Amino acid sequence: MQISEESKERLVKVFNIGKTVTHYGWIPLILWLGYTQSNPKPQLMRVINPLA
């Protein structure tokens, strides 16, 4: 089964978008999960800047 050129281009575009979203969203996701799942909740400024 062969994939058409148009389908290949769409797949490449989707993978590139997914790669970009993962690249820029990974650390904010981890920070958000840590902030929402911790008990007691730290002050938001301490999460963003530990020296504050």
Curated annotation (Swiss-Prot):
Annotated disulfide bonds: none
Lineage of source species: Eukaryota, Fungi, Dikarya, Ascomycota, Taphrinomycotina
Membrane topology classification: Single-pass membrane protein
Name the record gives this protein: Mitochondrial import receptor subunit tom7
GO molecular function, one term: ATP hydrolysis activity
Compartment list: Mitochondrion outer membrane
Gene Ontology cellular-component terms listed: endoplasmic reticulum; mitochondrial outer membrane; mitochondrial outer membrane translocase complex
Transmembrane segments: 20-36
GO annotation, biological process: protein import into mitochondrial matrix; protein insertion into mitochondrial inner membrane; protein insertion into mitochondrial outer membrane
Organism domain of life: Eukaryota
Keyword tags: Membrane, Mitochondrion, Mitochondrion outer membrane, Protein transport, Transmembrane, Transmembrane helix, Transport
Record-stated family: Belongs to the Tom7 family.
Quaternary structure (record): Forms part of the preprotein translocase complex of the outer mitochondrial membrane (TOM complex) which consists of at least 8 different proteins (tom5, tom6, tom7, tom20, tom22, tom37, tom40 and tom70).
Cytoplasmic-side segments: 1-19
Main localization category: mitochondrion
Residue spans, topological domain Mitochondrial intermembrane: 37-52
